[in-house]
Amino acid sequence: MITLPQLITTDTDMTAGLTSGKTTGSAEDFLALLAGALGADGAQGKDARITLADLQAAGGKLSKELLTQHGEPGQAVKLADLLAQKANATDETLTDLTQAQHLLSTLTPSLKTSALAALSKTAQHDEKTPALSDEDLASLSALFAMLPGQPVATPVAGETPAENHIALPSLLRGDMPSAPQEETHTLSFSEHEKGKTEASLARASDDRATGPALTPLVVAAAATSAKVEVDSPPAPVTHGAAMPTLSSATAQPLPVASAPVLSAPLGSHEWQQTFSQQVMLFTRQGQQSAQLRLHPEELGQVHISLKLDDNQAQLQMVSPHSHVRAALEAALPMLRTQLAESGIQLGQSSISSESFAGQQQSSSQQQSSRAQHTDAFGAEDDIALAAPASLQAAARGNGAVDIFA
């Protein structure tokens, strides 16, 4: 068993060469000096509360003692600065508290309660809301820069924003904008015109009562002129302008149905049968004139005139082509038979190259030309000729009857 010799060391020897040992600026030295400055024998007691004034007084003493003992002013200067900052902060806090108490004293109890509640909410919000760092602010500014710009509303020319929009506070207060002067002027003008109209109507009625009797046309004209002063009436509609439109509408011919077409070969049995059926259809419909188109367009049309009188039919057909007229003559027996089956007897029929109206027109033209020639000859006969009186007397005679003739 090995026994080590007991080493007797002191506190001063252990901390002599170490920088981490107890120095003059340690907390224990500061407390010891502070206790000595406050009282030599600890007169205040261990449980006594230290005030700011006591700290300032102790700081002044400590600074002097430190300078006298060690000659290093660094610790004393630091202590003095700390005490000065604490004193300034305390003075500012006291000033703020004094002002707040003065403001609270001026408020009513209800307002005081509301103010305290608002201050408590603000303090809680400040505690809960963390302060934004520089990085967060930079990110927010970048996001705002990326947002699209809001379009700026350009006011219309001759129009002010005050005329178009009404402020929200004014609406909440119930302040409505006054009517523009132009609208007031318009209303006053309309009232003035209304008064003029009533005055003119009253004047017209007075004139009618006192003066000579006015015709209804004059009274209507006066009322119309009074109404024109207020507002312009619509354009008058004249009957003369409407009559030509009506006459032109009535003068338009009615749409005529297209003539049926005989598509069968000309002169064939099918063609004769189709022709007879078409004529029978005309008689049933009561048509007095009709047209039939032939299949080759070069053949033209067949004009038919039909007259019915007590189940007696008179038929006239016109075609400019000779072979078409021959085909019509060949179809007459079949047509006569079908009419007889329907109880209609074909009395007179004619087929020609000109219509009956054309024949009448040509005959009337011939008669008029003959009459013109006769009138010319008569005019020539009426011309007075120079003849002896004996010849004129012989031509007239003496009124006696010659019994020997």
Curated annotation (Swiss-Prot):
GO cellular component terms listed in the entry, alphabetical order: bacterial-type flagellum hook
Keywords: Bacterial flagellum biogenesis
Nucleotidyltransferase in keyword set: no
Disulfide-bond pairs as recorded: none
Function: Controls the length of the flagellar hook.
NCBIfam families for this protein: PRK10118.1 (NF007514)
Protein name as annotated: Flagellar hook-length control protein
